Amino acid sequence: MKLILTISAMILFLITGCESGKQPANDFLTVDITANYPKKELILQDFLDVEYIPLETNEEFITSASMQAIGKNLIILRNKNGQDGDIFIFDRTGKGQRKINRSGQGSQEYTNIGSIALDEEKGELFINNYYSSQFIVYDLSGNFKRTLKYDKDFNFNSGKIYNFDQDNLICYDEIGNYKNLRKSAFWLLSKQDGSIVKEIELPYEHKISPFLSKGGWAAGPRNTELISQNGSWVLVEPSTDTIYSYSQDHSIKPFIVRTPPICSMAPEVFLYPSILTDRYYFMQTTKKQWDFEKETGFPRTDLVYDKQEDAIFECVVYNLSLIHI
């Protein structure tokens, strides 16, 4: 039986929608998300180098393996619920290097792990202790270094904080999506004290939330809004029609423009970028629909732009490693 690998939103470049100002005339891809594109089948191993790393397992290194960061030499994991406080450090061969647990109520401890950012050059781990609106910084042996207190109005509980450069973290604040607040979602925060270094502003006319709520329950797509890609960053603002790349030199440029405008659709259909390769741009459309009784919805379509053929397709990706399992 063939097994299909679905490429869901992981990597790419951003959207500006219902915004004032003229769209750029070149150097970006235009995607009509209402079009019926021809089908295309791809083999994962034809465009990506696939590596499987078995993690060392023993009495100390037993983990449900929620991936937090991958560096040149290290892999950082926590357990999926993030509440037991365990942090696991493996090398790139899968050999366990260290288990850290600084869970507790003390000033140098965390009560929860929302996510972990790794600065491999400085040997620092940034623990998102989001219930206390702070990042706690440890070295790779688990020794406390400092606490970074951030603004309590930020909502980083989605766990999207990453190492941006030597001095800053890049973070995604999703509180505006929940409350329809007109505010920036992307920020650079200082690694030294957690202060705001830069607000990354993306233009849009009014806030459009990808979330739906009913009776105190909320549901939203699980696509990613902030991803690193070849030294630049993908910033996905659901209220916009243009997908941008944000570079280390703080320059920002359009990469993909979606049509029709997001503000013209009911229900809205969002475009989330995914993996970028030298030849292919993977994307996913997500429709804002959810059945709260059946707990199903947000129907998706996987797309790929083939640069060699200069054409967009609806795609299915097969993983040869799984086909004969």
Predicted segments with their positions:
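C-terminal motif of bacterial Sec signal peptides marking the signal peptidase cleavage site
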Residues: 15-17
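Blade-loop segments of beta-propeller domains
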Residues: 58-60, 95-121
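Beta-strand-rich domains and repeat architectures in extracellular enzymes and scaffolds
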Residues: 51-85
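Structural signature of eukaryotic scaffold interfaces centered on beta-propeller domains
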Residues: 66-69, 116-120, 160-165, 214-230, ...
